[in-house]
Amino acid sequence: MKAVVFAYHDMGCLGVQALLDAGYEISAIFTHADNPAEKVFYGSVSRLAALAGIPVYAPDDINHPLWVERIAQLAPDVIFSFYYRNLLNNEILKLAPHGAFNLHGSLLPKYRGRAPLNWVLENGENETGVTLHRMVAKADAGAIIAQQRVAIDPEDAALTLHKKLCQSASQMLEYALPAIKQGQTQETAQNESEATYFGRRKPEDSFLDWNKPATVLHNMVRAVADPWPGAFSYVGTQKFTIWSSRVHPRVNAAQPGSVISVAPFLIACGDGALEVITGQSVDGITMQGSQLAQTLGLVEGSRLNSQPVCTVQRRTRVLILGVNGFIGNHLTERLLREDHYEVYGLDIGSDAISRFLTHPNFHFVEGDISIHSEWIEYHIKKCDVVLPLVAIATPIEYTRNPLRVFELDFEENLRIIRYCVQYHKRIIFPSTSEVYGMCTDKFFDEDHSNLIVGPINKPRWIYSVSKQLLDRVIWAYGEKEGLQFTLFRPFNWMGPRLDNLNAARIGSSRAITQLILNLVEGSPIKLIDGGKQKRCFTDIRDGIEALYRIIENTGNRCDGEIINIGNPDNEASIEELGKMLLASFDKHPLRQHFPPFAGFRVVESSSYYGKGYQDVEHRKPSIRNARRCLDWEPTIDMQETIDETLDFFLRTVDIVEKSS
């Protein structure tokens, strides 16, 4: 029987050897290149394959169509996965007529997902095991072919349990693989009601919170003991790792995290105390507990921390280019509300941010990003987070000035992106909902929707493709050079200070500002191509709160993510927006100061925007990533946004224009 194998780690080696021993013909093995940042203590699948004369590959993306085609050409009868770290898509799974099988390190359906070895120890389980199961689209959910139990002894830590699981897996494969080959398997469906799932472990999962019981912390030490990265704590700002420990009953009333004694090195916990048997300072060597306490300068009564304690907390420096714009000025207001941000801003005007100019944590320079390149480079080096918000983002300019759109939106921003790469700075880049173009999906999804634009002779797409190419450049810099980034895509944000009425007079504004100008001047509201195009309108306060959470980046959850920020519940056509705005206008206390409503007028897009324009019928965001990364949900109803936006502009007109 001809097999294609996906394998890594010790389990990968023993799986490959078991297949060879069972008489399988292995056509190819797919594995991973070792990560230099990872401590490699396990066997090499690639070396084993090479010694056995089997072709071996380590692709970056096994699910790429080219690799799927190459696997199809191998014509496998069966597919096996032994601790391969990437999910295989359905296109690969269906290539094997006798099925695809995966070796998992737990007693499924318990502990599906990543790192079951570590999670069972941390959770204090006394039993785990190994499972061979069919592979289906849902991870670790297929029917069970074989299963073997493994007892977890109190003295077991990660490495000893790993060795037990490897031994048990070898025994199980010895009888399971011939059964698969002979078509004599007995399969048991998994009970979904009993399923549990655990994700990839993150560094913060190994923080030792001294408020927890000593038993819980001891289990955490066991779960990530050497050669895993280890459980850790801090003495002030100094990090140290505990490699092995022992639980003691509480011997006094010390506060959690207090050092009860240094010989033995005993630390008070929420319940009981933890004795450090062996440990290591961040730049030191492994040593026994009492020596470690001495090395760390600890005495009885010293306090430990779960997080580093800094005597002086420097404010996070945020550079906003285009700080006077709609998003920039609202974001500045939100950041300055907190005392831990310092905002540096550049723009060609300051009318929208004049209220911040005297704030001690706000630093502004009036200037043009195409001229002030030295200032920009210096402040990118100086700041922690960079938001390049400068762009031409009004549709009429895409057809009126396409080259200027390209020069500013693409070329100037590319220079800023490269500075961020050069100086290792985090960039939060404003992509746009425009990148989805004429996508036909019901909900536009950051990770799966196609980005579809029109022909070259439609210059309205120059903004969309400029932004899309920058998205791709940033993504590539993240993948290849470690750029820390987040892309966010606003969906029709509205609110006070969106454009201004002077911009609307020359057609260079967003839809609602243009409609308000029509009402203020008593001119007809123009409905481009009938105004049936639908958009999802988002209140600026909802949008800014999401953007603020991206800047906060709790748990680094936003790194490398693309995040739609919009309100899918606030969907309306431009015609409906105009009618809602008219109703709000008629109820406004300043209504009497303005001319009568001049009605709606349907106009062709070519006569308004020019011959190079194309419109999009609908644009509704999926906000799955925003919910997952930001714990964010839009809350403000569209009518409230319309009322407040209209009120802001009408009062501006009354104060400024009517008095002139």
Swiss-Prot record:
Mind telling me what this protein is named?
A: Bifunctional polymyxin resistance protein ArnA
Where do the segments described as Formyltransferase ArnAFT lie? 1-304
Q: Which residues bind (6R)-10-formyltetrahydrofolate?
A: 114, 136-140
Gene that specifies this protein:
arnA
List of catalytic residues:
104 (proton donor), 434 (proton acceptor), 619 (proton donor)
Which keywords label this protein?
A: Antibiotic resistance, Lipid A biosynthesis, Lipid biosynthesis, Lipid metabolism, Lipopolysaccharide biosynthesis, Multifunctional enzyme, NAD, Oxidoreductase, Transferase
Question: What function does this protein fulfil?
Answer: Bifunctional enzyme that catalyzes the oxidative decarboxylation of UDP-glucuronic acid (UDP-GlcUA) to UDP-4-keto-arabinose (UDP-Ara4O) and the addition of a formyl group to UDP-4-amino-4-deoxy-L-arabinose (UDP-L-Ara4N) to form UDP-L-4-formamido-arabinose (UDP-L-Ara4FN). The modified arabinose is attached to lipid A and is required for resistance to polymyxin and cationic antimicrobial peptides.
UniProt site (Transition state stabilizer): 102
Q: Which NCBIfam families is this protein grouped with?
A: PRK06988.1 (NF005414), PRK08125.1 (NF005998), PRK11908.1 (NF008872)
Site (Raises pKa of active site His) at 140
Record-annotated residues binding UDP-alpha-D-glucuronate? 393, 398, 432-433, 460, 492, 526-535, 613
Query: What HAMAP family does the record point to?
Result: ArnA
Annotated stretches, region: Dehydrogenase ArnADH? 314-660
Annotated Gene Ontology cellular components are: membrane
Cross-referenced Pfam families: Epimerase, Formyl_trans_C, Formyl_trans_N
Q: In which pathway does it act?
A: Nucleotide-sugar biosynthesis; UDP-4-deoxy-4-formamido-beta-L-arabinose biosynthesis; UDP-4-deoxy-4-formamido-beta-L-arabinose from UDP-alpha-D-glucuronate: step 1/3; Nucleotide-sugar biosynthesis; UDP-4-deoxy-4-formamido-beta-L-arabinose biosynthesis; UDP-4-deoxy-4-formamido-beta-L-arabinose from UDP-alpha-D-glucuronate: step 3/3; Bacterial outer membrane biogenesis; lipopolysaccharide biosynthesis
Binding of NAD(+) occurs at 347, 368-369
Q: Which reaction does it catalyse?
A: UDP-alpha-D-glucuronate + NAD(+) = UDP-beta-L-threo-pentopyranos-4-ulose + CO2 + NADH; UDP-4-amino-4-deoxy-beta-L-arabinose + (6R)-10-formyltetrahydrofolate = UDP-4-deoxy-4-formamido-beta-L-arabinose + (6S)-5,6,7,8-tetrahydrofolate + H(+)
Give the family, as the similarity comment puts it: In the N-terminal section; belongs to the Fmt family. UDP-L-Ara4N formyltransferase subfamily. In the C-terminal section; belongs to the NAD(P)-dependent epimerase/dehydratase family. UDP-glucuronic acid decarboxylase subfamily.
